[in-house]
């Protein structure tokens, strides 16, 4: 999500097969990102027990627990703080590599970059399958974060095969992939949490297989299918005549890239995207721990939450946003969506921490998901419309990179707030941040079509 009001992207007829492959790529990326959401507390508990008495994890958790006891915080609050730190590392890798993959795809094409990064993702899932110790799990998540920076490449490919007038509809397809991934990943994680391969084959523990290997195996299988499909069927979406130059090492630096955008509209859109992602990531960071602490939710209960979010997201981004964002305008849709998320976040904090009401929680989750759907489609359309054709990958890469930076910082901040002040305060702070993003978004320029 950025802003550039210069060269129009060429009118290229949509290629349904390529869009289908792009859709699957995004879908599987989101599965990998979200598959461990509902089992996060249980996984952390398992690793802590396994490595008790020694090792890096045991040392870190012991220090956090001593702080928790001094602050009268619960063990779940300690887990949320630690999980937030882990999530930050994953997203930090995406922040560093997203502009690199995006710019590289502008130079050599989308297809080779997608093949490389998806193969790397498959390797990360293989490591997770055999991550019987915490360091191997940590390495798998780092590699997954590096390769997960290919989201900007996939979205740039959508821009390649859609016209400017149909850009919102193309980004709606992206939104459906996000919604399905956010539905399927937690569902796989939650519904397979009880499938422990060690119960049937205990000897596999010697090879690093652990109680949570099944979700990783499923994600690995999906990733390999995706890799084979792209190898066999994906048609390059960026023709050689539309490709840009290769970037210097300095230009590939994500921090340097952020300060080399001359257009003030792009800079403002990047700021809006950073703020809204930072605020929204509070939800992803602590919802599992907050509901487990206040409502005693199990992984199966959390799976139902994520299924609800995924279904609403699919309908919103695949149907409602695709239809109404072009009519309402990208700017209005983005601001309205951010405002709705902000209001709903305050309601989520109240529903869980004060009212302890599941029906109210689901209502607020539905509203926040609708707002997020409109904001995501509208902002993705804006940044694509602002960017010149030969820099779609780079501009989208910078925008996504800022989003990943927000996701790198947000889990640690949200975990710290939850650790010190509880979930209700954390969601109220998130609400204020999101309403602030809506205020910033009101100053975005309208794109030329």
Language model features with spans:
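Short amphipathic helix-loop junctions that connect adjacent transmembrane helices
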Residues: 39-80, 285-302
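C-terminal transmembrane helical hairpin of 12-TM major facilitator-type secondary transporters
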Residues: 331-379
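Juxtamembrane intracellular "pre-TM" segments in multi-pass secondary transporters
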Residues: 5-16, 235-272, 294
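Helix-breaking motifs and short loop linkers at transmembrane-helix boundaries and internal kinks
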Residues: 109, 130-135, 296, 351-355
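Cytoplasmic helix-loop-helix junction between adjacent transmembrane helices
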Residues: 139-178
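C-terminal membrane-cytosol helix-exit motif in multi-pass small-molecule transporters
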Residues: 220-240, 440-444
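Helix-to-loop junctions at the C-terminal end of transmembrane segments
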Residues: 97-109, 316-330, 418
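Conserved MFS/SLC helix-loop-helix module at the cytosolic interface between two early adjacent transmembrane helices
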Residues: 95-134
């Amino acid at each position: 999500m950025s802003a550039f009001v210069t060269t129009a992207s060429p009118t290229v007829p949509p290629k349904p097969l390529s869009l289908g492959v792009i859709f699957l790529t995004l879908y599987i990326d989101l599965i990998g990102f979200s598959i461990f959401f509902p089992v996060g507390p249980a996984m952390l508990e398992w690793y802590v027990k396994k490595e008790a008495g020694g090792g890096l994890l045991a040392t870190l958790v012991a220090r956090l627990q001593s702080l928790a006891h001094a602050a009268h915080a619960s063990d779940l609050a300690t887990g949320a703080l630690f999980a937030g730190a882990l999530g930050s590392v994953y997203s930090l890798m995406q922040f560093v590599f997203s502009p690199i993959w995006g710019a590289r795809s502008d130079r050599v094409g989308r297809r080779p970059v997608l093949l490389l990064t998806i193969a790397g993702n498959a390797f990360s899932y293989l490591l997770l399958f055999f991550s019987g110790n915490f360091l191997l799990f940590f390495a798998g998540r780092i590699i997954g974060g590096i390769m997960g920076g290919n989201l900007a490449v996939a979205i740039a490919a959508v821009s390649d095969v859609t016209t400017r007038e149909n850009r919102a509809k193309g980004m709606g397809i992206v939104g459906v992939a996000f919604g399905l991934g956010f539905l399927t990943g937690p569902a796989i994680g939650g519904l397979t949490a009880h499938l422990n391969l060690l119960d049937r084959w205990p000897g596999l523990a010697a090879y690093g297989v652990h109680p949570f290997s099944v979700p990783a195996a499923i994600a690995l299988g999906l990733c390999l299918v995706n890799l084979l499909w792209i190898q066999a069927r994906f048609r390059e979406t960026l023709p050689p005549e539309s490709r840009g130059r290769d970037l210097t090492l300095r230009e590939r630096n994500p921090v340097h890239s952020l300060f080399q955008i001359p257009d003030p509209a792009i800079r403002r859109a990047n700021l809006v995207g950073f703020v809204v992602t930072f605020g929204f990531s509070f939800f992803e960071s602590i919802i599992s721990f907050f509901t487990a602490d206040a409502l005693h939710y199990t992984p199966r209960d959390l799976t139902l939450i994520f299924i609800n979010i995924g279904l609403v997201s699919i309908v919103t981004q695949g149907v409602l946003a695709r239809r109404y964002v072009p009519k309402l305008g990208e700017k209005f849709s983005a601001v309205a969506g951010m405002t709705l998320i902000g209001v709903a976040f305050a309601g989520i904090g109240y529903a869980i921490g004060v009212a302890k009401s599941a029906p109210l929680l689901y209502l607020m989750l539905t509203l926040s998901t609708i707002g997020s759907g409109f904001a995501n489609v509208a902002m993705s359309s804006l940044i694509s419309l602002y960017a010149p054709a030969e820099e779609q990958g780079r501009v989208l890469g910078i925008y996504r990179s800022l989003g990943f930076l927000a996701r790198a910082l947000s889990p640690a901040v949200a975990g710290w707030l939850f650790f010190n002040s509880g979930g209700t305060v954390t969601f109220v702070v998130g609400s204020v941040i999101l309403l602030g993003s809506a205020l910033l978004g009101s100053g975005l320029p309208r794109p030329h079509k």
